Amino acid sequence: MQHTGNCETLIVNSCFGSTCARSIPVFIDSCDLTAEVSRDEETRLARSMPVVLEKIESIIEKIFQTSGPNIVHDKDRAKIALCRLLLGPVAVPCFCEEWDTNDYLSKSGCKCIGPILYIHTSRCRCSDIPVFKFSIMKDYYASHVFRGLLSLKEWNTHLPNVLCTCELSMSDRYVATVYPKQNSIYLEYYPYFLCYLCRHLTVIEIEQCTNDLISLLGPKVAQRVIIHFKLLFGFRHKPHIGTVDSWFWENFFMLELHKLWLTVVKHNRVTTDFFNVVYEKIQNYKQYAIKTLRMSSKAVPAIQRLCLAKFKQQLLYLNIKVTVKKNKREMCLNGFVYGKTLYVVESSQLIFRNLLLLYYDYSLPDECKTNEENVLTAHYIRVISRLSFKRSRSALPPGVRPDFIFVAQQPKRKELPNVPGGIDFAEITSVRHGAVTLNAFNTNKVMNLKATISKRANFVYHRIPKTMTHSFVMYKHTFKEPAFTVSTFVSNDDLDMSSLNINIRGPYCDFLYALGVYKMHVSIRDLFLPAFVCNSNNSVDLQGLENQDVVRNRKKKVYWITNFPCMISNANKVNVGWFKAGTGIIPRVSGEDLQNVLLQELNNVREIPGLVFDMDLHQLLVLLEQRNLHQIPFLVKQFLIFLRLGLLMGYGHSRRNKVHDIMLHLISNGLFDFNKNSVANTKIKHGCALVGTRLANNVPKIIARQKKMKLDHMGRNANSLAVLRFIVKSGEQKNKTVFIKLLEYLAETSTAINTRNEVARLLQTLTAKVKT
């Protein structure tokens, strides 16, 4: 005790820091002290012990504290504690005089044939705490043992050693982590250790950690690890209630079902009736209900009563995913049978399968019992007694690091927020291959979802053809704001529900808004999300491509669509259509499938010989696309291209970086931003309905040779060469000198042979016209 001024401060000097554990070698390479654990010691481990939850929690907390000061995250500490428990308890026999004993030595009188430690206390300079000098003897009486958990040497580098380190050459891989004798570990404690570990780790993470440990230590040690893994999950009886009120255990299932009730998105007469019936049966037929709720996924029960109309509504409102199959009496998980039909639910919704059985009065046979594996401690004794680490050692597999240290989690880089509704609803999908970026924009998507009808009186049976047994389109609505089309499918075998087919363009928020608008106009009670995207059309532009014609000339076969050619390529079994000016369309796919198609197609495009990109222009146009989340209209793109071309001619090609910075500044400040609601290039019915037919057909036109011509007839993505070619060939240019300067600059700066040849022909044509 130290005195500080007028107050007394009690300072307790602990040589162990925040943990009371210590490390001791087991000498596996030389004499293997672990092989000398007597059968009496194994019997002690496996004997039945009274479970005191406070003591067990104190032990596992001490195992957690052994992880070391560098491990700051609870999940990493839990993994190291799990690995120690998987390697299992170990005892190191020794002989010492009574006056040399401490809190780590437990009495254990037995005759040892193999080597044991002879230890005596020493004040050696190699340590600031009392340590033991030691020697190894054979065929000697063991008076005490050190008890703890087997560990790897790298896990215990921060722990003080029991033995004197100046005489210790630590070349062995295994050590023992020993604890005070009042913290003895028994096999009975293992399932309770699992309860503590599950506060920080999921079962999947526990299994993954076990597999990593087995792959690190080799197959010969796998048996020992697997035995202790099974012991963790070895509850053979109901845990003691202890201080918990018995009322809680009697109402445990009711509380769990109440949690399911709270997870239901919408409560109505369907969900209320379902849970009320289940609650009533649990209260009135407790044993029957518990057996039904505990039914294994491997069992395929058959029910005798099922109301299909009510069953379909229950699936919708409870969000239960069910697959309907023919009952072929095959092995099936998570299913039940009604008549000749097999209904299979998802593995994560097995509890709902059992609740449905309870609701529809499934009679549980008495002989139907779950055969759960029971871990016997006798099996543990037989295996561990034969298991010597000297025989079990195995070399590391090739490529496996010798370390097994859990590193503290690194702070993750802040990522962009997720797309609302998922990547299937993304307005833009970007991929990158090298320095080239490809942006795909969704033109429209078709989605299916379920809905329930609110007014059955509107449907008259005789209006529906009796021969029509499948769904057909009952209604079709087209809306202007937001612009979308809805087809309503109604089947004559179910007048309470309908399927909706929605054709829309835009983000997920627009889709939700469209559903609200649709619900105001029709007799729909509830809409069930998430919607399934069954079709999605996308459009892409190859920005900054100098020789755009080579994209469609890479294959011989060209399909003719309407009045212009379209080259069809195939990527991941999806046909990609390439039009003039490097514009493509990708049908059917969205989300990750669309990304894979884009990467494959971009890789194919990059392999085209002679392909040349103006990377500065490519970067500017891609930035403008990503800024506006829309494809760039023709006039905006030409304004940007020729403004940049004029600046390059004014500043000179040597100062192109200055021009690039100017253009980046203009784009970042919104000079080239445009209205996304332009319908000049669309042919979608509901897109045109937004502004009306007359305005939708009002595509910008120019007069060339006393004839009106659509401004984008050469392609929305036309580059400067395509526009100059059109102007020169039309012969309507007034100041030919300006066009000659533009073409000469393109000839000087372009690296594409096709571009230079085309520019030379255009210059020859213009020069001839100037002379004449």
Swiss-Prot record:
InterPro entries: Herpes_UL87_C, Herpes_UL87_N. Signal peptide: none annotated. It comes from the Viruses. The gene is U58. This is Protein U58. Belongs to the herpesviridae UL87 family. It holds the Pfam family DUF587.
